[in-house]
């Protein structure tokens, strides 16, 4: 006996029976009863009511619903089409600092303002403590500063240009040149040209003495003329 005949004898008949049983079970399961077909034909609404609507995971549509040509072609090709999902973007309010702005639109640094206010309070407190720890003489000196400053501000000075705007204040009249320049108000030695010194002259004569000698000689000549005239005889 060959090996082929042995295997066919031992294993062949049992496999054929199992295959035939499987085929018979499938055929019996696929054949519908005539009674069920007739009942479904008589009640057309029964089929629609008993169907459960469910979405296919791969295609994302309702089975049995009519599809357009484009969708059916794309599904046949293996392309899954999903509608665009609308996601609502919620504003991220966590860990966001509030921005403060002034009337011009510039950002206001709140921390810097608080630091400035704290430093100002600290400085004012230190100044108050310093004044409290002062002696009577130092406090009297502080009071005198304001009185002295008010005295100087109330005083009217001749060289103040702002006095020209207020005509009600009593200002000492000062000599003014034809060109509008202020002249020296005190006494000064004259010169042969008749030029007066400026208002800022300190009164010190810094010339070489020629003007003084010239005026002295002019006086001597005038006196000699007078003497000659008086000593002359009348005829």
From Swiss-Prot:
Q: Indicate, by first and last residue, each region the UniProt record lists as having compositional bias (Polar residues).
A: 28-46, 69-78
User: What are the GO BP annotations of this UniProt entry?
Assistant: maintenance of RNA location; mRNA splicing, via spliceosome
Chief location of this protein within or outside the cell: cytoplasm
Q: Where is the composition biased (Basic and acidic residues)?
A: 1-15
Keywords attached to this Swiss-Prot or TrEMBL record, sorted alphabetically, are: Cytoplasm, mRNA processing, mRNA splicing, Nucleus, Spliceosome
Q: Which domain of life is it from?
A: Eukaryota
> Keyword Cytoplasm, does the record have it?
yes
GO cellular component, as recorded: cytoplasm; Prp19 complex; RES complex; U2-type spliceosomal complex
Q: Does the keyword Transferase apply?
A: no
Q: Where is this region: Disordered?
A: 1-52, 64-85
List locations, semicolon-separated.
Cytoplasm; Nucleus
Q: Which GO terms describe its molecular function?
A: RNA binding
State the oligomer form and interacting partners.
Associated with the spliceosome.
What role does this protein play? Involved in pre-mRNA splicing.
Give the protein family.
Belongs to the CWC26 family.
**The protein's name in its UniProt record:** Pre-mRNA-splicing factor CWC26
The scientific name of the source species is Candida glabrata (strain ATCC 2001 / BCRC 20586 / JCM 3761 / NBRC 0622 / NRRL Y-65 / CBS 138) (Yeast)
Q: What is the lineage of its organism?
A: Eukaryota, Fungi, Dikarya, Ascomycota, Saccharomycotina
């Amino acid at each position: 006996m060959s090996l082929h005949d042995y295997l066919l004898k031992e294993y062949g008949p049992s496999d054929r029976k199992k295959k035939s049983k499987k085929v018979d079970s499938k055929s019996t399961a696929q054949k519908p009863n005539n009674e069920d077909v007739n009942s479904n034909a008589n009640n057309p609404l029964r089929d629609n009511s008993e169907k459960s609507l469910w979405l296919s995971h791969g295609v994302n549509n309702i089975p049995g619903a009519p599809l357009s040509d484009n969708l059916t072609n794309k599904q046949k090709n293996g392309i899954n089409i999903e509608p665009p999902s609308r996601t609502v973007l919620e504003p991220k309010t966590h860990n966001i600092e509030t921005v403060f702005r002034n009337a011009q639109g510039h950002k206001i640094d709140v921390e810097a303002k608080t630091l400035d206010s704290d430093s100002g309070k600290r400085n004012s407190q230190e100044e108050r403590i310093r004044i409290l720890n002062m002696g009577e003489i130092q406090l009297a000196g502080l009071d005198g500063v304001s009185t002295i400053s008010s005295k100087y501000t109330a005083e009217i000075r001749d060289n103040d240009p702002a006095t020209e705007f207020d005509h009600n204040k009593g200002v000492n009249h000062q000599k003014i040149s034809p060109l509008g320049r202020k002249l020296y108000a005190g006494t000064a030695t004259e010169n042969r040209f008749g030029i007066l010194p400026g208002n800022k002259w300190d009164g010190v004569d810094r010339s070489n003495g020629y003007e003084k000698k010239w005026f002295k000689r002019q006086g001597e000549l005038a006196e000699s003329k007078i003497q000659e005239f008086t000593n002359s005889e009348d005829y």
